[in-house]
Amino acid sequence: MGNVTAENDILYAYWLANISGVGTKTIHQLYKYCGSAKTVYEMSARELSQLYGVTEESAMRISDAKKKWDLYGKWERLVSRGISFVSLEQPNYPKRLRHLYDPPYGLYYIGQLPPDTPSAGVVGARNCSSYGKKMALRIGKCLGSNGVCVISGLARGIDGYGHQGALEGGGKTYAVLGCGINIVYPPEHGALYEQIAAQGGILSEYPPDMPPSPGYFPMRNRIISGLSDALIIIEAKQKSGSLITADCALEQGKDVYAVPGRMTDPLSAGCNHLIRQGAGILLSPEEVVSELGLLSEKNKLPLEKSQRLVYSCLDLHPKSMEEISGETGLDPVTLAQLLDGLEERGLVRETWQNHYISVN
């Protein structure tokens, strides 16, 4: 048990978060009026029922839960599974979430909790296109390599590629689940789940072993946007869970960016709609990095000779790889590698397939 004692509020908070049949709204009411889970634990059913918003049925459930809950034993079993728990009562509860209208009372996590440093949410279509995949990887990598934490939901498609890009960029990334913390969903993201836990963290407001349910995902979306300073949408249909996340972000006063797409592409309908409604048009991930004031020092380093050769022949007018190769004398393979490196540093941007411009 280490230094956990009966006086440690986390034991009572863990109990309060797990009372069957008592909803989040009631838990918030109890916390508001009582100030701590320990105080709730020490109250009788009659005292609880006299609190505003607490029904007699809820009061009885809470009272009965004390008899069935082993404070020490339950906590030991949780810790033995490698799972951590934090509540609104603890000082290490994520600061950004405290300001939400309906913050989760408790969070389960594996790995680390998100630090109070610049972060961006990256979400989008599960059945994304190859272009969407490319953008998610590129954006995630740029954010990660520039010190921006990437927040997403571990879903198929854009979410997973956003996480992967951040990991490839050597950055931290955090996944917010719509199920129990120990459930890998979708199952094919097992390896990615482990990488995220090792290089960031996995979070959920739902207790361990809770299976995924359609109703849980809209709820977790408010946490994704809540943990983010800015939200990036990469491909979304007109009716999409990503738009719910965008609504959450706007309600929370966060900046929302959307990657534009073709008018005829259903996967771009949601993003184009957001842009029409006033969302920022994301033309390069460096825009978000710049807005967060985190342009990496590596972008200020001098270029190598071959990089200068490529960069010097570019301007604001798009040039094809064939044109660049002709001007520099570089073979296509070498040129592609150099362009990728310059793009990572935010110095060039691909405007459409194999056409590039300089950025700075």
What is the predicted role of each segment?
Residues 2-7, 87-360:
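Glycine-biased, small-residue-rich flexible motifs in mid-sequence functional cores and linkers
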